[in-house]
């Protein structure tokens, strides 16, 4: 297939937005120049392991970059890691991931694709499952693959190195993960592979295996791991600091309002379709002293419309939030209250006491029983109710005490 492309400089401007690491820019430009000259689209690979059913905004960052390549005329190749998911990516883990069955990964993959369709046109993608080439491998094939790397090389990975130094188990099958991901690149003859910065080791393994197979090494293009609502840890469902693609417009808007001001520009850049020029204007306005809340509300609306909501739904979500929080019901400058994430869920009375919103457990129980405790405006009446709080939620004790949840 041949086609006309926009100029290399025009493509680079689009493709480099939000990129934080690249191996290498020179190679990407060379591949684009050859693509323009020959009319052959680059094959741009993104692999996802369907280890869960629902996507957060954090998952959309590499998906949005894949969309950029597709809109520049290139062939997006989405690898459903139904086989690698049964191993579990050890990246950033202090312990081995639980292994999933093939039935579980198949069901998760279907849900993933349904949600990914909110980010890009999946009908334009070449969708492959790595069980196509990994499942038929014989044991001798696996041994030959294992011979492509060394234990010393694997221990260069920070997560493996840390576990080794702490005496935590590292299972042999975990060493295979980067080799399996690299084999995917060989199988689909990837020109470019996308991933988060935490995937660099795995992406580079693909380059090594492609060289060994006589292929031109892929360019490795990495996007950031964006912080969640707490502004500290990466966005994660397990931490509760996330905005999900399956959230309602009201939930999306409300959660956006809970982010620290320092994340406003980051979220505009990586999670919305707002033009870069407008983002720069917003950044300059905040630097000049304009109220960040104005732009946080704009961000909330933009997130809703970017992921399938209508302008009307975004407007109504803002109106409902304003009615609850801004018209004298809740102050905008709510102090943070720190709660230990490891102790959640926590009984309501202990939440009040630990957050410093009640002087004692007995006073906390009395306040709750009298109807004086709310979480995001919803009354809690049982002092023993187990609360699985998330970052950004607003606690109110009595008439005037407020706290915004931060988990540590």
UniProtKB/Swiss-Prot annotation:
<dbReference type="InterPro" id="IPR002942">
    <property type="entry name" value="S4_RNA-bd"/>
</dbReference>
<keyword id="KW-0436">Ligase</keyword>
<dbReference type="InterPro" id="IPR002307">
    <property type="entry name" value="Tyr-tRNA-ligase"/>
</dbReference>
<keyword id="KW-0547">Nucleotide-binding</keyword>
<dbReference type="InterPro" id="IPR024088">
    <property type="entry name" value="Tyr-tRNA-ligase_bac-type"/>
</dbReference>
<comment type="subunit">
    <text>Homodimer.</text>
</comment>
<dbReference type="Pfam" id="PF01479">
    <property type="entry name" value="S4"/>
</dbReference>
<dbReference type="GO" id="GO:0005829">
    <property type="term" value="C:cytosol"/>
</dbReference>
<dbReference type="InterPro" id="IPR024108">
    <property type="entry name" value="Tyr-tRNA-ligase_bac_2"/>
</dbReference>
<feature type="binding site">
    <location>
        <position position="237"/>
    </location>
    <ligand>
        <name>ATP</name>
    </ligand>
</feature>
<dbReference type="InterPro" id="IPR002305">
    <property type="entry name" value="aa-tRNA-synth_Ic"/>
</dbReference>
<keyword id="KW-0030">Aminoacyl-tRNA synthetase</keyword>
<keyword id="KW-0963">Cytoplasm</keyword>
<dbReference type="Pfam" id="PF00579">
    <property type="entry name" value="tRNA-synt_1b"/>
</dbReference>
<feature type="domain" description="S4 RNA-binding">
    <location>
        <begin position="346"/>
        <end position="407"/>
    </location>
</feature>
<dbReference type="GO" id="GO:0004831">
    <property type="term" value="F:tyrosine-tRNA ligase activity"/>
</dbReference>
<protein>
    <recommendedName>
        <fullName>Tyrosine--tRNA ligase</fullName>
        <ecNumber>6.1.1.1</ecNumber>
    </recommendedName>
</protein>
<dbReference type="GO" id="GO:0003723">
    <property type="term" value="F:RNA binding"/>
</dbReference>
<dbReference type="GO" id="GO:0006437">
    <property type="term" value="P:tyrosyl-tRNA aminoacylation"/>
</dbReference>
<comment type="similarity">
    <text>Belongs to the class-I aminoacyl-tRNA synthetase family. TyrS type 2 subfamily.</text>
</comment>
<keyword id="KW-0694">RNA-binding</keyword>
<feature type="short sequence motif" description="'KMSKS' region">
    <location>
        <begin position="234"/>
        <end position="238"/>
    </location>
</feature>
<keyword id="KW-0648">Protein biosynthesis</keyword>
<feature type="short sequence motif" description="'HIGH' region">
    <location>
        <begin position="50"/>
        <end position="59"/>
    </location>
</feature>
<dbReference type="InterPro" id="IPR036986">
    <property type="entry name" value="S4_RNA-bd_sf"/>
</dbReference>
<dbReference type="InterPro" id="IPR001412">
    <property type="entry name" value="aa-tRNA-synth_I_CS"/>
</dbReference>
<keyword id="KW-0067">ATP-binding</keyword>
<comment type="function">
    <text>Catalyzes the attachment of tyrosine to tRNA(Tyr) in a two-step reaction: tyrosine is first activated by ATP to form Tyr-AMP and then transferred to the acceptor end of tRNA(Tyr).</text>
</comment>
<dbReference type="GO" id="GO:0005524">
    <property type="term" value="F:ATP binding"/>
</dbReference>
<dbReference type="InterPro" id="IPR014729">
    <property type="entry name" value="Rossmann-like_a/b/a_fold"/>
</dbReference>
């Amino acid at each position: 297939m041949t086609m006309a492309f926009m100029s290399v400089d025009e493509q680079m401007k689009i493709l480099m937005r939000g990129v934080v690491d690249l191996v290498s820019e020179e190679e990407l430009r060379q591949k684009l120049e050859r693509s323009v000259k020959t009319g052959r689209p680059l094959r741009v690979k993104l692999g996802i392991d369907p280890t869960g059913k629902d996507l957060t905004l954090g998952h959309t960052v590499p998906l949005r970059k894949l969309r950029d390549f597709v809109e520049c005329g290139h062939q997006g190749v989405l690898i459903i890691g139904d086989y690698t998911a049964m191993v579990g990516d050890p990246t950033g883990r202090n312990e081995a991931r639980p292994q999933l069955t093939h039935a579980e990964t198949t069901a998760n993959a279907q849900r993933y694709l349904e949600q990914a369709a909110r980010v890009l046109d999946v009908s334009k993608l070449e969708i492959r499952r790595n069980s196509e080439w990994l499942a038929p491998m014989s044991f001798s094939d696996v041994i030959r693959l294992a011979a492509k790397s060394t234990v010393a090389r694997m221990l260069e990975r920070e997560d493996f190195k840390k576990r080794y130094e702490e005496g935590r188990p590292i299972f042999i099958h975990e060493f295979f993960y980067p080799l399996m991901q690299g084999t995917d690149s060989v199988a689909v003859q990837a020109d470019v592979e996308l991933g988060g910065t935490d995937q660099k080791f795995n992406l580079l393994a693909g380059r090594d295996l492609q060289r060994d197979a006589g292929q031109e090494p892929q360019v490795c293009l990495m996007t950031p791991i964006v912080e969640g609502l707490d502004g500290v840890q990466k966005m994660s469902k397990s931490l509760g600091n996330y905005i999900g693609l399956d959230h309602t417009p009201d939930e999306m808007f409300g959660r956006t309002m809970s982010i620290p001001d320092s994340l406003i520009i980051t979220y505009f850049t990586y999670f919305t379709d707002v033009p870069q020029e407008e983002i720069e204007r917003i950044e300059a306005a905040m630097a000049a002293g304009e109220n960040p809340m104005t732009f946080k509300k704009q961000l909330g609306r933009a997130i809703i419309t970017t992921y399938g909501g209508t302008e009307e739904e975004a407007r109504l979500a803002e109106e409902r939030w304003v009615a609850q929080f801004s018209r004298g019901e809740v102050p905008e400058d709510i102090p943070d209250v720190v709660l230990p994430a490891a102790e959640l869920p926590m009984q309501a009375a202990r939440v009040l006491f630990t957050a410093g919103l009640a002087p004692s457990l007995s006073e906390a129980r009395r306040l709750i029983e009298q109807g004086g405790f709310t979480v995001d405006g919803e009354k809690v009446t049982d002092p023993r109710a187990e609360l699985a709080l998330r970052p950004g939620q607003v606690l109110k004790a009595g008439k005037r005490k407020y706290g915004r949840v931060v988990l540590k």
